[in-house]
């Protein structure tokens, strides 16, 4: 079966593993998924990730993060720009997620970055997802 939205699949696998309190989740690799994983790690939403070669496209193993009492660090993940309805914004119109408590992941000419970094660089782009 052909997957029409691999980024939505990536976010859904993380969301489902997080809800089931799994320690880690394996996801088929791609460059944009690696970039999103790096952002999630840098912003403190996941513990770590590693890319393994499986003689095909590779696999990203994402290690989920939980609080000291087992509470989830990721409260929500939402896909914004979809293949059927792309969502592009200018630098002035970049969204704030939960008044700055969450992040928007934006694909720009400067790479895949957070909404905060995009504001600092004054670049707009495609809003991929919200994470809070």
UniProtKB/Swiss-Prot annotation:
Keywords (A to Z) from UniProt: Ribonucleoprotein, Ribosomal protein, RNA-binding, rRNA-binding
Ribonucleoprotein in keyword set: yes
PROSITE patterns: RIBOSOMAL_S8 (PS00053)
Keyword check for Ribonucleoprotein: yes
One MF annotation (Gene Ontology) recorded for this entry: structural constituent of ribosome
A biological process term (GO) from this entry: translation
One Gene Ontology cellular component: ribonucleoprotein complex
Coiled-coil regions, chain positions: none
SUPFAM superfamilies: Ribosomal protein S8
Assembly behavior: Part of the 30S ribosomal subunit. Contacts proteins S5 and S12.
UniProt family annotation: Belongs to the universal ribosomal protein uS8 family.
Summary of the function given for this chain in its UniProt record: One of the primary rRNA binding proteins, it binds directly to 16S rRNA central domain where it helps coordinate assembly of the platform of the 30S subunit.
Name of the protein in question: Small ribosomal subunit protein uS8
Gene: rpsH
């Amino acid at each position: 079966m052909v997957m029409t939205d691999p980024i939505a699949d990536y976010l859904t696998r993380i969301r489902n593993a997080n809800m089931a309190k799994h320690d880690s989740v394996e996801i088929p690799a791609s460059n944009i998924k690696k970039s999103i994983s790096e952002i999630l790690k840098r912003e403190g939403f996941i513990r770590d990730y590693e890319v393994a070669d499986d003689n095909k496209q590779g696999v990203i193993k994402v290690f989920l993060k939980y609080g000291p009492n087992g509470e989830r660090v990721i409260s929500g993940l939402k896909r914004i720009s979809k293949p059927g309805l792309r969502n592009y914004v200018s630098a002035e119109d970049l969204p704030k997620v939960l008044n700055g408590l969450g992040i928007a992941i934006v694909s720009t000419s400067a790479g895949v970055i957070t909404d905060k970094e995009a504001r600092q660089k004054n670049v707009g782009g495609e809003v991929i997802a919200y994470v809070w």
